[in-house]
Amino acid sequence: MKNDQKYDIKVQVRTTYLQDQSDPAQEQYVFAYTITINNIGSVASQLVSRHWIITGGDGETREVRGLGVVGEQPLLKPGESFEYTSGTAISSIAGSMKGSYQMVAEDGFHFSVEIPEFILSVPRVLH
């Protein structure tokens, strides 16, 4: 088995615009994102840290780094998944996020998992 199959983590993202927490008059648009992390590899691996790049539609970019996710550093055995919901605010009606998780496998191998870019967008309202 190749290493990339041995250490194989899949990331899926769903987003929701939080209208009740947003304040367009103050250019604050709040979004929730739910992430599902699946270990489809053959070795248990622990998520130890995260790195986000958050970009607003105006081109403003900020980076966020930290240990774990939502206060946890989940250990995922082969076939297991972990899901969490978090949020962010941007100053425009659309933007994006992307990043990576830093993982450590039970055999001590350190690797990075890409979080594919996803869109944050206020839904259009039809009158």
From Swiss-Prot:
Residues 3-127 form the ApaG domain. InterPro entries: ApaG-like, ApaG_domain, ApaG_sf, Uncharacterised_ApaG. It comes from the Bacteria. This is Protein ApaG. It comes from Nitrosomonas eutropha (strain DSM 101675 / C91 / Nm57).
